[in-house]
Amino acid sequence: MPSGAIQIDGTVRYVALEGGFWAVRGDDGVTYDPMNGLAAQYQRENLRVTLVAKMRDDLGGVHMVGPIVEVLSIQAR
């Protein structure tokens, strides 16, 4: 795993705010906001995924659902 990266196991959710976007609700109870969205094949409600991501505390966003993450890799489970 790259330096500074974390692994997130969770469920893909569609959030119907600000025009709608896809997020990942982690098994830890935190909703993560992928900074560049999710690729089309992962845009499925309730899809279980594992992400390797970096927290991007240096960025702000309009979604306001949880921390912004830079997805380094994603796999459906």
Language-model-detected regions and their locations in the chain:
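General beta-strand recognition
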Residues: 13, 21-23, 70
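OB-fold (S1/OB) nucleic-acid-binding surfaces
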Residues: 17-32
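Beta-strand/loop nucleic-acid-binding surfaces
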Residues: 29-41
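Flexible glycine-rich surface loops and low-complexity tracts that mediate binding to linear polymers
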Residues: 46-60
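OB-fold/S1-family single-stranded nucleic acid-binding modules
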Residues: 58-77
